[in-house]
Amino acid sequence: MTELQAKDPQVLHTSGASPSPPHIGSPLLARLDSGPFQGSQHSDVSSVVSPIPISLDGLLFPRSCRGPELPDGKTGDQQSLSDVEGAFSGVEATHREGGRNSRAPEKDSRLLDSVLDSLLTPSGTEQSHASPPACEAITSWCLFGPELPEDPRSVPATKGLLSPLMSRPEIKAGDSSGTGAGQKVLPKGLSPPRQLLLPTSGSAHWPGAGVKPSPQPAAGEVEEDSGLETEGSAAPLLKSKPRALEGTGSGGGVAANAASAAPGGVTLVPKEDSRFSAPRVSLEQDSPIAPGRSPLATTVVDFIHVPILPLNHALLAARTRQLLEGDSYDGGATAQGPFAPPRGSPSAPSPPVPCGDFPDCTYPLEGDPKEDVFPLYGDFQTPGLKIKEEEEGADAAVRSPRPYLSAGASSSTFPDFPLAPAPQRAPSSRPGEAAVAGGPSSAAVSPASSSGSALECILYKAEGAPPTQGSFAPLPCKPPAAGSCLLPRDSLPAAPATAAAPAIYQPLGLNGLPQLGYQAAVLKDSLPQVYPPYLNYLRPDSEASQSPQYGFDSLPQKICLICGDEASGCHYGVLTCGSCKVFFKRAMEGQHNYLCAGRNDCIVDKIRRKNCPACRLRKCCQAGMVLGGRKFKKFNKVRVMRTLDGVALPQSVGLPNESQALGQRITFSPNQEIQLVPPLINLLMSIEPDVVYAGHDNTKPDTSSSLLTSLNQLGERQLLSVVKWSKSLPGFRNLHIDDQITLIQYSWMSLMVFGLGWRSYKHVSGQMLYFAPDLILNEQRMKELSFYSLCLTMWQIPQEFVKLQVTHEEFLCMKVLLLLNTIPLEGLRSQSQFEEMRSSYIRELIKAIGLRQKGVVPSSQRFYQLTKLLDSLHDLVKQLHLYCLNTFIQSRTLAVEFPEMMSEVIAAQLPKILAGMVKPLLFHKK
């Protein structure tokens, strides 16, 4: 490009320029139009204007994606503008054909001036112009597509519309602050979803600058500015600015950056190429700007490109949320520029601004937002706006965001889901639902999870999925206006943060059940048409409030505990069928010695109960069947449970008199044989240990070493059972822990041999030694053993039981007294508690005796006989201690195995006991 071409008056349209054919492809060529002001200013212009480099050709003002240029024309409206045009040199009123669209002032002419200043610098003499097809191909501003009108004449002139890309607001001359410079006017003729984002200096396409508002008296000049920056200005000064002829100064009220619009809506702009002004739509209106408004408060919605088609509220909200959460959205980076205050700065309060399909749902931000923190959820406006609370009455004055829309550190609250700790929600198995990452660490939600939030909300309530807890709660399923399924914050139930999480889903009353809440009503109306199968997950309040605890009332009551057949009643203390009842009676009375052909683990059920009588009898004994046991048929279980709740140990030490001892006896009809036992004795029955097996192999021949090893294994298991039983014993836990250990170590052998006597007495009527269901020794097997004399010593106990006909209640009380029958010589640490406990169980033994004896003399004699038996056990157990210690010492020689716990007890305590370092507590003197 030659110097003559650079000095062509058509390069820059100024006052007095003569028309000449334009160069196609040059973006700065003037329109093919001869304005009313034509003079001779060629020399002035040529001294300023410089050629444009070819590298920037087509990029400064790219063509819009439309057809060839449309010729411009003037209308008869210039008559009304003659006075105004005469006052402004270099400025004219541009009108479209037919007067349908009047050219509005360029909203951001300061950007154009900055671009002109930046790019109109000498870059050499070589310059060429792109052809029209080449220019058409380089269109980086076609991203808005059909959103912009294809024909500028199609826009009504009465609207006064200018594209927000090139529009700017009116600013008073005296207001030079950054906040005031960035004010925008909400258009009346265009809803916020149709607005477009205003490019700022931070944009990649606009290397813009700030504004220096100052009046200039020069007319129609294009001159170089000093480039200095006025104090208080929003950004660096613009260069090559067209100055107005009659500037009024700061007090004149005239805008410093652009000419004010005429009262009739007709505004003035500099001449320029029609190709670059065609897609522009004005946003200027006569209404004043809102004070303190954020410059992006009404333009961010345009950036996300919301379609104009009528959409469902839920779909529009989901689409908006999806666009806000996408990676392409930089969290409001476009807000950084000279037209808006920096993010994090406080915004002045402003009235609520309508927001498209969500009217009256925004309010200004209260307080300073956190620096560089963009909300993850809820607010699709800029930091200057937040979702407004729907409140009524006096509460409307207190503006606070909805708890389920807040993205801060405060905990969220949801109507149907109480608060809970913040776990990540597992991926859901519901069809059509994507996994949503919850918790403070999640930065976004996948777009798939954003669609269909209304159905998601309903399915959450129906299926009972736990809510995601974290810095935000589940999103609302509908706009706040109509049919919302969310309640305001005031109606939410307060739940403590430390409370345990309740049931998975809250009960919803349906079909005549308890009253439906607001959320349940929405669910009832919407769910059957959407997802009928999920109605099966709903349950009434009565069912949801029940805890998953199973008492004895909920267990099957008509099943035989032995074979699983239908039970006919409670026989020998156990709920059994008639077949098992007869079998047990015949097996006990006939004294049969059954042997298992297997490993004592045969299956006993309705079909195979007759295959192995040994295992069937073992199972009967394990279930607690006792020959001559009490019949508790049709007994009120509630009364028994209330009796157990009233258990209390008496505090007095003295023995009760006869009336007190016999006062607990209640007589019923003889056919029922039901007696109400004392509460403490009844509790002792409930904590009685289960049957323990020895694990002896009866298929192998009996040897002394194998039998002793099996007895040691049985003793180890019974020792553990004694520890468990003593811990459940009323009053025993009140003793010192050392005293508890000492009492168990001193009495474990007495308890084992006493239990052996009771089992032999009840199961085999004292004819054999019933060590365990899988280890029963008759007299013939005893004689073959090396410890036959020891077996005869132990056999004395069941024989005494048979002689005295000891009852179960008496046995339970005597067993506890055996635990408290031996103490150290120096006494126990909690000696007083020990004596009180022992006296209490002595009284319980007297009560147990009074259940059977009907007089003072028989009861006293019975008490003497039973206590004498307890005293005799000391000498009997001493023989067992001596034999056990000798066998333990010679265990390697005798090939007898001792378990670990039993070995420790034997090595630590048996030498003390045999040396007389313990004190036996006797009822009678020798």
Swiss-Prot record:
Residues that, per the record, bind progesterone: 759
Protein modification: Phosphorylated on multiple serine sites. Several of these sites are hormone-dependent. Phosphorylation on Ser-294 is highly hormone-dependent and modulates ubiquitination and sumoylation on Lys-388. Phosphorylation on Ser-345 also requires induction by hormone. Basal phosphorylation on Ser-82, Ser-163, Ser-191 and Ser-400 is increased in response to progesterone and can be phosphorylated in vitro by the CDK2-A1 complex. Increased levels of phosphorylation on Ser-400 also in the presence of EGF, heregulin, IGF, PMA and FBS. Sumoylation is hormone-dependent and represses transcriptional activity. Sumoylation on all three sites is enhanced by PIAS3. Desumoylated by SENP1. Sumoylation on Lys-388, the main site of sumoylation, is repressed by ubiquitination on the same site, and modulated by phosphorylation at Ser-294.
Annotated stretches, region: AF2: 673-926
Family: Belongs to the nuclear hormone receptor family. NR3 subfamily.
Span of zinc fingers (NR C4-type): 560-580, 596-615
Role, per record: The steroid hormones and their receptors are involved in the regulation of eukaryotic gene expression and affect cellular proliferation and differentiation in target tissues. Depending on the isoform, progesterone receptor functions as a transcriptional activator or repressor.
Source organism (scientific name): Mus musculus (Mouse)
Linked residues for Glycyl lysine isopeptide (Lys-Gly) (interchain with G-Cter in SUMO): 7, 388, 524
Region of interest: Disordered: 1-48, 168-256, 327-364, 391-447
Locus of motif LXXL motif 1: 56-60, 116-120
Region feature Mediates transcriptional transrepression (in isoform A), mapped onto this chain: 166-305
GO annotation terms (biological process): epithelial cell maturation; glandular epithelial cell maturation; lung alveolus development; maintenance of protein location in nucleus; mammary gland development; negative regulation of gene expression; ovulation from ovarian follicle; paracrine signaling
Phenotype seen when the gene is deleted: Infertile. Inability to ovulate, uterine hyperplasia and inflammation, severely limited mammary gland development and an impairment in the induction of a sexual behavioral response. In isoform A-defective mice less oocytes are produced, only a subset of implantation-specific uterine epithelial target genes is regulated, and an increased progesterone-dependent proliferative activity of isoform B in the uterine epithelium is observed. Isoform B-defective mice showed unaffected ovulation.
Segments of this protein annotated with the region Modulating, Pro-Rich: 1-559
All copies of domain NR LBD, residue ranges: 672-906
Protein name: Progesterone receptor
Annotated Gene Ontology cellular component terms: chromatin; cytoplasm; nucleus; plasma membrane
Subcellular location field: Nucleus; Cytoplasm
Sites bearing Phosphoserine, chain numbering: 20, 82, 131, 163, 191, 214, 294, 345, 400, 669
Region spans: AF3: 1-165
Regions of compositional bias (Pro residues) in chain numbering: 339-354
Domain notes: Composed of three domains: a modulating N-terminal domain, a DNA-binding domain and a C-terminal ligand-binding domain.
